[in-house]
Amino acid sequence: MRVWFQPPGGEWKEVDRICLTNYAVTTITDLENGIADNFARYVPEQVARCWPTRGAVTNLPLVCQSGQSQSEVNWNISIAGFNVSITTQPSWAWDFDGSILFTRKPGGPYPITEISHTFSSVGLKAINVTTRWNGNFRVDSLESIAIERDLFQSTSINVTVGQATARLRCPGVRLC
């Protein structure tokens, strides 16, 4: 149900949407809180990985994936006695030790290089990935409503980046 308000001498304005059941009021905010409390059960877990798993070196790309699908995720739950249908789509933010990449692609192992980063210095590097799930919900088959608050998952992995060294070899020659 839409809630309207008209200040004295003013125009009518929609101020909220609510659901009524047994004389109890459930607001859109209440429904969004219920969705946020439950969404982690229904969306794929992050299993972030990067390749090479060992032996990463400077000036060569490190290829990564979130471990999630880019497909939308749908689920139904009951909140305050209402059947709530939720549809969400993921997007990702990768933080490669201060270098940020925003994408709608989940990445993958080589040869999928859409999520990659080339480090220019050696050391232990923190890689953080945040999945943002945005979408909409529908209460008892009524009109679809955008989820106003963002639903996030985050994880991080550490990668040691070394320096590649060259070694000259001359098979069959006494001195190179």
What are these regions (language model features)?
Residues 1-176:
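Extracellular/lumenal mature domains of secreted and surface-exposed proteins
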